């Protein structure tokens, strides 16, 4: 869907605008220096638009054989991108060094099968804004991965540190303090020591709704983090929570209408 009037009205982007009628869009990413240039990951690869979503074209590259669930662009070097794939296609973290023109597989490994979803899927990729070689990848349902060398080698975060393999999303705030935020099924974990230790924020105990999905750091205000939740999936209601202190305290934001589904 696309709105050209700040969200008052919405229209479906269809085949007339270049997107195949049965394409299932899983993620969006906006070029940090060219706000009209948008990437859309889907079950056919990656579509791109250079006119703020009015028209689209399908990029021809190896990702055409994969379902793309997540995208990340380095804010300092937009030519550096990562794409995560999965269900029903293999789980891979791809890397591009030329703005998405070409892609290569990184060495990240994932389980072939996992509970609930079958083939795991990369549901979140976060590039550390203070160190572009540090990337965090969340996999549903196969845990959290981290690379300190731009994707050449990877480590798996121990299950005892984050006792939930069902990763929904991940973000990194520059802080201070620099904070890694990991969204899991029914909770959120934060780390201020680059993943050495983790702390639960207690979603079930402290929030009205207990099914978190989306996480976003506000550009230009790294201590401000937004979290989207629902009652379940697909759910019957949702909300947006905001933290102004890098995840220590949260407030529910008012919405103009009551959502009828979980917010992703």
Predicted feature locations:
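Extracellular glycan-interacting surfaces
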Residues: 1-264
